[in-house]
């Protein structure tokens, strides 16, 4: 079984190939399933497994979906072979509109990362950490907070490097969805922020995720190039989610009698 990971790197921005949410599907599936038949693919081949990310625009008819999400409305590219779980109810709605069967099993599999790693929070060195989406990383709003002692966390630092960085802060601000999801996974208080508002798909994936974990819809706090540490202290930080990890894991395709032969 080939597990799909979207490669957004290019000659100008090669490090985007390491965007955290795009590089965790393969290790998640390989570790949780214990399958020896798992392969990684960055290609839009038919018959792949879609797991983490807003990647349902890359669907083919033979694909399986376990946790993936839509980037926006009307972006489902094909009818997959079977859907086991999706990121949230907005994604499910996009599938059902097209007549595609989709169970009400929700959850971004990135929330399972603590189950396959050994990272523990001890004594954070920084009070605040900012995770800019990679389209936001060079903006004045980021530099402004960096000068005030906020730890700037690179979402493209690498699978383990990124986790180590978020372990080092008390409160997370993020314009990246997977910055928020990673924070939730390890129980780090977090808040969505907007920097440039250039994210493709707008609020869709954020709302989809909020609904999946029973969180009030959050459109984000707008950072300015004059934002102060005092302003950050007034933001409402999320600290809890409603997430049934066992239900998501039990919905996995390698546990389905019809599809387990693809994994073992």
Label the predicted regions.
Residues 1-264:
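Active-site anion-handling motifs in enzyme catalytic cores
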């Amino acid at each position: 079984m080939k597990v799909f990971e979207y490669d957004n790197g290019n000659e100008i921005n090669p490090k985007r190939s390491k965007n955290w949410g795009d590089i965790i599907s393969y290790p998640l599936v390989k570790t949780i399933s214990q399958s020896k038949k798992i392969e990684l693919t960055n290609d839009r081949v038919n018959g792949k497994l879609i797991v983490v990310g807003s990647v349902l625009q890359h669907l083919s008819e033979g694909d399986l979906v376990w946790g993936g999400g839509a980037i926006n409305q009307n972006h489902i590219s094909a009818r997959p072979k079977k859907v086991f779980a999706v990121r949230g109810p907005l994604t499910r709605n996009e599938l059902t509109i097209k007549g595609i069967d989709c169970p009400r099993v929700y959850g971004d599999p990135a929330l399972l990362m603590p189950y396959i790693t050994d990272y523990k929070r001890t004594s954070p060195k920084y009070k605040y950490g900012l995770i800019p989406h990679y389209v936001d990383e060079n903006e004045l709003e980021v530099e402004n907070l960096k000068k005030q002692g906020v730890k700037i966390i690179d979402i493209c630092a690498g699978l383990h490097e990124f986790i180590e960085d978020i372990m080092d802060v008390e409160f997370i601000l993020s314009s990246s969805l997977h910055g928020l999801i990673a924070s939730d996974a390890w129980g780090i208080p977090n808040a969505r922020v907007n920097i440039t508002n250039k994210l493709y798909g707008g609020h869709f994936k954020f709302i989809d995720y909020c609904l999946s974990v029973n969180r009030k819809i959050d459109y984000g706090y707008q950072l300015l190039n004059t934002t102060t540490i005092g302003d950050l202290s007034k933001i409402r930080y999320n600290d809890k989610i409603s997430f049934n990890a066992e239900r998501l894991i039990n919905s996995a395709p390698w546990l389905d009698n019809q599809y387990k032969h693809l994994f073992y």
